[in-house]
């Protein structure tokens, strides 16, 4: 039986309070880090753990930290990406609402490792409760010596600030988030330079996801070998999976990285609704290409899903049953990306505009011969030709829908109607 690590406090009464967190051993990792490790040793510990970023890209966290220049001549910043705008994803919200001190401790240890004295937590503006709980937790931590000047009697100074987002999905992209933090229009930057060298205010900056940072104190307390012992060697550790869609028991599940998608859906989430069958599953938020029912044995980790033609992304698992029209679903998803495109890149801005028009035409029973080929051409023109991955996510998802459920698109065009209505 897998014992929760990241979610161990979420169902504890008053789990968001400092007293509850301390009673469960909270902030011991920060004491240990400051008292027993140098910053470089913390970086090496996280490298050895093989912790990979939980925000979507899966980049090795310790390696990202090591890119920060030792003597930059400028202040260093730590930014927590808590924007969480990916449809089907809600894991970070639960941590911030129910166990905010876990994130704050992760921020403090991580900042100590990279030499940052200031952190910004960029929270999705709609997360009103999460923002309130984080602000309360920051105040508690400051009053009790876990934040501020000379933390726990050490020479380490550290402050955390909350920044509320204004509803733009693009701020989930790290450099667009930095632009927003600086008070500018949220649009992705051209890289290089990468944030580790020139990020917030042109200073060295590390950007990590909420779940990634929450893992750090546990690695400090239990060791890198413990972390590597959970899940696959190349993608180890506990993982938060967000289950939603047409499934009996939607919710947030913490399980080892690498669990099969079928086990996750059928055993833990209870399978499809009564009288229905699973048709497909989106494994990592709507940016991730759909996995058809026959391929659900795939492991829920970065490498396995990439090999299967999809991606783990934010682990927002959306279950789709046999009552769903894939043309309608694909249209709604592309409409979302079209609406959220920042407009900076022509292939994304214009390509998604045309893609929406063609999909709506097909959905309405007004599709024409050649429309599917046109959609494929549009996907080819968008993919790999934009500053960020928003356009890529849209193109990959639509390509997968056309590949696995082409017959439904053809039926809409040939029969001039939706077969599901």
From Swiss-Prot:
Binding site for [4Fe-4S] cluster: 342, 345, 348, 388
Function: NDH-1 shuttles electrons from NADH, via FMN and iron-sulfur (Fe-S) centers, to quinones in the respiratory chain. The immediate electron acceptor for the enzyme in this species is believed to be ubiquinone. Couples the redox reaction to proton translocation (for every two electrons transferred, four hydrogen ions are translocated across the cytoplasmic membrane), and thus conserves the redox energy in a proton gradient.
EC number per UniProt: 7.1.1.-
Co-factor binding comment: Binds 1 FMN. Binds 1 [4Fe-4S] cluster.
Protein name: NADH-quinone oxidoreductase subunit F 2
Signal peptide feature range: none
Annotated gene: nuoF2
Cofactor: FMN; [4Fe-4S] cluster
Reactions accelerated catalytically: a quinone + NADH + 5 H(+)(in) = a quinol + NAD(+) + 4 H(+)(out)
Organism: Rhizobium meliloti (strain 1021) (Ensifer meliloti)
One GO MF term: metal ion binding
PROSITE patterns cross-referenced by the UniProt entry: COMPLEX1_51K_1, COMPLEX1_51K_2
Pfam families, A to Z: Complex1_51K (PF01512), NADH_4Fe-4S (PF10589), SLBB (PF10531)
Residues binding NAD(+): 53-62
UniProt family annotation: Belongs to the complex I 51 kDa subunit family.
Binding site for FMN: 165-212
Coiled coil region boundaries: none
Record keywords: 4Fe-4S, Flavoprotein, FMN, Iron, Iron-sulfur, Metal-binding, NAD, Plasmid, Quinone, Translocase, Ubiquinone
